[in-house]
């Protein structure tokens, strides 16, 4: 016989096997000292027409989730001798609290995600703007470097320096040589 363990409602653990309700257990005790689980078992017993003695082996007439859905959707107690003790109200409140907490957690997650996305977009835009700004300034900078080199190295010396840079093994030096050559040629 395959045993299925499920948490069907916050705070209530239910063990089911092939449609048989084997055990319902509450994680918290209520203020009277009687566990909500005992009240739940008794309520399920009455709804499913099971006596307390045969409760462990009795066959449920409806799937368990229908029983819980009946309690939650009706928003009013199913008539049992335990209704007065408020088990149904507690189940509904626990379910509502669970839904509310889940929604709050979801909203916090969405809010954090939106903030993180906004920061990412902002940083990306700033990096892009810096990059664009550097490339716009670059021709002016290389032109001023070329001017300076022309003043220091007269005649063909500047062309020799640029040519040496272009043949250099390092990519940065080659790139600098090419940009300086463009700047020198445009002057």
UniProtKB/Swiss-Prot annotation:
Q: Where is this region: Disordered?
A: 104-136
Keywords noted in UniProt:
Host cytoplasm, Host nucleus, Repeat, Secreted, Signal, Virulence
User: Which cysteine pairs are joined by S-S bonds?
Assistant: none
Report the principal subcellular site. Answer: secreted
- Give me the ranges of the annotated region Leucine heptad repeat region: 50-92
**Basic and acidic residues: compositionally biased ranges:** 126-136
Q: Where is the composition biased (Basic residues)?
A: 111-125
> What does the UniProt entry say about where the protein is found?
Secreted; Host nucleus, Host nucleolus; Host cytoplasm
Which parts of the sequence are annotated with region: 4 X 11 AA tandem repeats?
Answer: 93-136
Cite the residue spans of the region called Highly variable C-terminus domain: 137-187
Give the UniProt entry's GO cellular component terms. extracellular region; host cell cytoplasm; host cell nucleolus
Query: InterPro entries, alphabetically?
Result: ATR13, ATR13_sf
Pfam families reported for this sequence: ATR13
Q: sequence repeats span which residues?
A: 93-103, 104-114, 115-125, 126-136
> What additional remark is attached to this entry?
The ATR13 effector protein is a highly polymorphic member of the RXLR class, yet only a small subset of the polymorphic residues appear to be involved in RPP13Nd-mediated recognition. Polymorphic residues of ATR13 appear as clusters across the surface of the protein. ATR13-Emoy2 is not recognized by RPP13-Nd because it has Ile-152 and Gln-181 rather than 'Thr-152' and 'Arg-181' within the highly variable C-terminus domain.
Listed name of the protein: Virulence protein ATR13
Gene name for this UniProt entry: ATR13
């Amino acid at each position: 016989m395959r045993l299925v363990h499920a948490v069907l409602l916050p705070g209530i653990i239910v063990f089911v096997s092939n449609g048989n309700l084997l055990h319902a257990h509450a994680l918290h005790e209520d203020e009277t000292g009687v566990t909500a689980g005992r009240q739940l078992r008794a309520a399920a017993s009455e709804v499913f027409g099971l006596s307390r003695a045969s409760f462990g082996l009795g066959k449920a007439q409806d799937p368990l989730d229908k029983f819980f859905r009946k309690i939650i959707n009706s928003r009013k107690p199913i008539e049992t001798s335990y209704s007065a003790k408020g088990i149904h109200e507690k189940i509904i409140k626990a379910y509502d609290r669970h839904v509310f907490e889940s929604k709050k957690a979801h909203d916090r997650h969405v809010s954090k995600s939106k903030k993180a996305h906004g920061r990412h977009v902002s940083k990306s835009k700033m990096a892009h703007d810096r990059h664009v700004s550097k490339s716009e300034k670059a021709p002016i900078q290389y032109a001023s470097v070329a001017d300076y080199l022309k003043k220091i190295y007269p005649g063909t010396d500047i062309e020799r320096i640029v040519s040496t840079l272009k043949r250099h093994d390092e990519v940065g030096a080659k790139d600098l040589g090419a940009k300086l050559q463009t700047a020198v040629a445009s002057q």
